[in-house]
Amino acid sequence: MIQKPLFSPQVEWLPPEEFPDLSKYDEIAIDLETKDTDLKSLGSGSITKNGEIVGIAVAVTDWCGYYPIRHGGGGNMDIKKVLTWFQGVLNTPAIKIFHNAMYDVCWIRSEGLKINGTIVDTMIAGSLVDENRFRYDLGSLGRDYVGIGKNEAVLKETADLWGIDHKAEMYKLPAMYVGEYAEQDADLTLKLWQEMKKQMYHEDVEDIFKLETELFPCLVDMRFLGVRVDTQAAYELKQQLVEEEKECLYKVKKETSIDVQIWAARSIEKVFQKLNLPYDLTAKTSSPSFTKNFLQNHPHPMVKQIARAREINKSHTTFIDTILKHSHKGRIFAEINQLRSDQGGTVTGRFSYANPNLQQIPARNKELGPLIRSLFIPEEDHTWGCFDYSQQEPRLVVHYAALQNLYGVDEVLDAYNEGDADFHTIVADMAEIPRSQAKTINLGLFYGMGKNKLQAELGVSKEKADSLFKQYHNKVPFVKLLMDNVMRRSQDRGQIRTLLGRLCRFHLWEPNQFGIHKALPHEAALQEHGPGIKRAYTYKALNRLIQGSAADMTKKAMIELHKEGITPHIQVHDELDISVKNNAEKIKKIMEAAVELEVPNKVDYESGPNWGTIK
């Protein structure tokens, strides 16, 4: 129970006396205040019913109101009346505007309410208008685009007097201290939407905003569906891995008499000293340095035990503990970041996840990866289906090269059109080099890798690498031609546009001369270096184009699947993971037809009793 202070700020706010009819309005902005106590540690409690809506703010062009229903400090209105009226507002055909729609819409659905009409999100709009901002919260966007920030002064003063956090514990305050703040939020969301419409028109990103808006209901359904996890198997695997880790450490102790702390460099140093093994020191502090690569590739059996113990430890602490922490009634409901936002997300349009981050579930470790992924299981009487675009990046490269009719692309184009082509094999044959080297060079160029890194990946001398690159570019000219064209365009225009119209902007500048320089905004770069400057990071332009276009394809496919009532559990990298029952062929066809390229799309499909059985 919080202690009411002797004095509180004077406020004039009063709750609305009526429930206005908003049916004549085309656009309605909505902002919720919630009790969401574990938001920071576990993510939003809307899906797991861990929390509740405490008040509803609604704004239209000439009115706004805040309806408090569950404030701990009192001043609430009749819940039934408010929710009945609010459902009426949600039933109208008006566009419903939110800032960070995923959060509020999930709480609305959790309350048992349904939303009619299109849902738009000013945070998504902000991210499409400028994907390189530092912040996307309502206050920051409002300040920058509308000239109005969030005024939290009274709210913060009151919360301080009550001894509570003005954001996380706002629900504890009497409604009278929150009302004006909540109304301002809804009103600012509406004003921001009016400005964002102009900005999106100006930037010509209305089509991609439409795509992201169409995708949103699918993502809400994915959030509520979640993914089943076998918690019993998770506990058992945890115990098994803990025992294996102990076994590794026991072997080290038996050999060296040292209880090694596997994450402490000073402790590992003692083992190396005992075994008379050389090791590196950091340049700055001369402290011992033991990188993952160094330990894993070390020939000594005791060092291998330390490396293995670290891998096992990471698997059960980072991954299994996270799965168990976030599982609720045998399911995980991860938060999906649709675009770049304060919660995460990417500049390319690809998804990211939080609470937990499903993209961190290991895939590369041949032994531990499948064990951890095997904890993810399909719906009852279904199989786990993994669908991914076959060679998505190479196909996009060929698509863009074909559009520009670049020299040498016809051979690959013909091979794709004739059937089951493998890009890396075709390129290897064209360049007269082994497939493994062709694949390394292909992917290195697609990802904007520098020459030195690519040479290291190839594992050859500088001379051999130079000879390989020369041979590759002579025999497979269209890749370098495309790279140069995309780079030139990004340098000239400061932006490139993906398959479905997403903008990738290059907003930072650096001096023309070679060297290591910090990339700066235009004015700052001019001041620092004078007029001899160029756009920075344009060597990544092809990668941005491919990554952004791949995101477009995947998102369009998800929209088409959702229209057919198919909701994925997970979208990671290029794959969609879906519970399958006699509909795998249908899913493949929908995905292959979602976006038309100059080359045919191909979707690879694998299935099994769980995620771990799929290679």
Whereabouts are the PLM-identified features?
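Short hydrophobic/aromatic beta-strand micro-patches
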Residues: E457, D577-K581
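Acidic beta-strand-to-loop metal/phosphate-binding motif
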Residues: A29, A94-A101, C386
